[in-house]
Amino acid sequence: MRSSNSPATVAPEIPTADETAVPGLVMSSWHAFFVPRGTPKEIIATLNAAAVKALSDPTVRARLTDIGQKLYAPEELTPEVLGARQKADIEKWWPIIRAAGIRAE
């Protein structure tokens, strides 16, 4: 079972959770670079530009697609979009974490 809302490109025969046991369950993962608070915006912009350049390389994109990674358009690969994604994930999962009594150790 896959927890995404779309079939895996590498194994499209595997049904999604929404299609089988858990309607409405959609989970995804994402990857990001983080820097210490107070890092100058110019450094953040330089690091982001390098990451976008690497992720725009056709060979890199093909390999990531081959292993089933969802790829985003360059305009979606910004600190602002990441911040919005983090905020949405926190708003979605925090009530569940709290209700389950999950605590960091």
Segments (PLM) and residue ranges:
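Conserved, function-defining micro-sites of small-solute handling proteins
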Residues: 1-105
